[in-house]
């Protein structure tokens, strides 16, 4: 399989968002490096398929990736048990490591970027038909509400970064978008209802 560092396009860096559950930290797989600030960066490259699988392992349905991995941090090498799960647990949009002027002491894959592309696999605006009365449905809607609020905060941050010229722009495609409300729909848009 293809390794992350083997994914190369001119001036393009790949970052796949995940969450390390033991330390409750962001875990980033990337073409530059992989790891989390608590453990450091992995000493070995990772398969793209493994990074994608870890990033998409929704905790309610799929198991986390549980491995002993070797890291390097501040020149020291150590092995840590690492439990990696869905990126949305810690940073649902995966943009926190892309914010300008991040400190690499507290985040991996820190890079200066001027344009951010983040994809959202959400359902769009709730239609109000849900009746979360019993415990399981209340818990699901609670998580959905937390994610929606986190998205709103991140959307606001991206708009402020653009308005202050800290980034040139951003693109936020998402599955739940209202295609009829797009200000400039592309001519080859595949509509949500198709």
Name what the model sees in each region.
Residues 2-101:
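Active-site gating loop/helix substructures
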Residues 31-39, 43-44, 74-194:
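Non-catalytic peripheral regions of patatin-like phospholipases
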């Amino acid at each position: 399989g293809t390794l992350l560092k083997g994914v190369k396009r001119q001036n393009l860096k790949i970052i796949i968002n995940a969450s390390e559950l033991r330390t409750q930290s962001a875990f980033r797989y990337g073409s530059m490096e992989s790891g989390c600030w608590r453990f450091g960066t992995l000493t070995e490259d990772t398969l793209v398929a493994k990074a994608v699988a870890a990033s998409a392992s929704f905790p309610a349905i799929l198991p986390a990736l549980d491995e002993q991995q070797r890291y390097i941090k501040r020149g020291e090498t150590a092995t840590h048990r690492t439990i990696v799960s869905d990126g949305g647990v810690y940073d649902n949009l995966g943009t926190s490591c892309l914010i300008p002027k991040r400190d690499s002491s507290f985040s991996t894959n820190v890079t200066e970027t001027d344009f951010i592309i983040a994809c959202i696999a959400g359902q769009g605006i709730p239609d109000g038909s849900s009746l979360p009365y019993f415990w399981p449905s209340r818990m699901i809607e609670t998580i959905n509400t937390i994610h929606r609020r986190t998205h709103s905060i991140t959307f606001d941050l991206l708009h402020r970064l653009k308005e202050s010229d800290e980034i040139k722009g951003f693109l936020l495609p998402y599955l739940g978008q209202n295609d009829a409300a797009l200000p400039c729909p592309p001519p080859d848009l595949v509509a949500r209802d198709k």
